[in-house]
């Protein structure tokens, strides 16, 4: 790559060309409208060119962006930008996006990942497929059903069979989910995990209490709107709309159950009507969690400015 005409950003173990797009994405995640974020990214670029800066340390770039935002009266955006850049650069964060089938966990997870620059998004359906490779049908038959049909293979029918089947199905998948969380925290890798198997009351408390783990539950309160999501999904994917509609009442039971368990565990519930609004609400929730993480470490804004990425 010919870097002679680029401004080079230098990290601790790498160098890369200054990217207005990456900076604009970071500013958007911090709360700026995309058009304003890109304009400020251009301003920063032009400022560096005017000063004839050819190589800039990443921490110095972060400091310049922070103070430029302050100078433009974007104080809250500046604080969020600083928080995100420091945390994502140095600390792992695991974001869990739960919700019943059809509420949009995949869409929201990928939107958040794009905003924050988190490269890894894992669906619990994928983890379920891995678990099926190592656990036989005879041992856990519910694992081989869908979340809303697991009740069919229960060996007893005490209580609400639909919810009990869902719980048995999810428990096996959560074993794999917890393994992924452990691995990411140990290796310092950020990840977003999304899916219907993320049941708050079935996940170990040590994960819910970990400041590096953020759990958000999505829902759609209106039944008709929820049902319309399946029709819309069927037009753009190969997923069988008829099957979802056949078990829609059970899916709604699971939706209500997941919202109830989230509230019981103090996990924020976000209704997913408009994607942009949902993403903004989720980012605000994640930001508040990260503030708690930083407070526990006793770091001030000045500390964050000085700490290299």
UniProtKB/Swiss-Prot annotation:
Gene Ontology MF annotations: ATP binding; kinase activity; phosphotransferase activity, carboxyl group as acceptor
SUPFAM superfamilies, sorted: P-loop containing nucleoside triphosphate hydrolases
Cofactor requirement: a divalent metal cation
Keywords: ATP-binding, Kinase, Nucleotide-binding, Transferase
Gene3D superfamilies registered for this protein in UniProt: P-loop containing nucleotide triphosphate hydrolases
Pathway noted in the entry: Thermoadapter biosynthesis; cyclic 2,3-diphosphoglycerate biosynthesis; cyclic 2,3-diphosphoglycerate from 2-phospho-D-glycerate: step 1/2
Catalytic activity field: (2R)-2-phosphoglycerate + ATP = (2R)-2,3-bisphosphoglycerate + ADP + H(+)
InterPro entries for the chain: 2PKG (IPR020872), ATP-cone_dom (IPR005144), P-loop_NTPase (IPR027417)
Its EC number(s): 2.7.2.16
ATP-cone domain mapped to chain residues: 5-92
Role: Catalyzes the phosphorylation of 2-phosphoglycerate to 2,3-diphosphoglycerate. Involved in the biosynthesis of cyclic 2,3-bisphosphoglycerate, a thermoprotectant.
Family under the similarity heading: Belongs to the 2-phosphoglycerate kinase family.
Name listed for the protein in its UniProt record: 2-phosphoglycerate kinase
Organism field: Methanocaldococcus jannaschii (strain ATCC 43067 / DSM 2661 / JAL-1 / JCM 10045 / NBRC 100440) (Methanococcus jannaschii)
Gene: pgk2
């Amino acid at each position: 790559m010919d870097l002679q005409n680029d401004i080079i950003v230098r990290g601790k173990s790498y160098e890369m060309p200054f990217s207005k797009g990456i900076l604009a994405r970071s500013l958007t995640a911090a709360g700026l409208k995309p058009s304003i974020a890109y304009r400020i990214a251009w301003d920063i670029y032009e400022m560096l060119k005017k000063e004839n800066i050819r190589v800039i340390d990443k921490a110095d770039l972060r400091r310049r962006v922070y103070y430029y935002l302050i100078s433009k009266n974007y104080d809250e955006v500046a604080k969020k930008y600083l928080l995100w850049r420091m945390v994502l650069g140095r600390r792992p964060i695991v974001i869990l996006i739960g919700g019943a089938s059809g509420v949009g966990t995949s869409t929201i997870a990928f939107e958040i990942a794009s905003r924050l620059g988190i490269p890894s998004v894992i669906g619990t359906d994928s983890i379920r497929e891995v678990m099926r490779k190592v656990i036989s049908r005879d041992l856990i038959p519910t694992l081989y059903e869908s979340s809303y049909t697991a009740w069919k293979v229960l060996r007893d029918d005490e209580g609400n069979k639909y919810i009990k089947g869902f719980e048995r199905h999810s428990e096996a998948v959560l074993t794999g989910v917890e393994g992924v969380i452990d691995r990411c925290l140990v290796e310092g890798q950020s990840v977003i995990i999304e899916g219907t198997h993320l049941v708050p009351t079935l996940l170990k408390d040590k994960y819910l209490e970990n400041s590096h783990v953020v759990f958000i539950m999505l829902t759609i309160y209106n039944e008709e709107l929820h049902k319309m999501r399946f029709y819309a999904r069927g037009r753009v994917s190969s997923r069988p709309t008829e099957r979802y509609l056949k078990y829609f009442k059970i899916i709604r039971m699971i939706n209500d159950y997941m919202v109830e368990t989230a509230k019981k565990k103090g996990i924020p519930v976000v209704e997913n009507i408009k994607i942009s609004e949902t993403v903004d609400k989720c980012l605000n929730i994640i930001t508040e969690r990260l503030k708690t993480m930083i407070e526990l470490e006793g770091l001030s804004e000045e500390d964050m400015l000085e700490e290299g990425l």
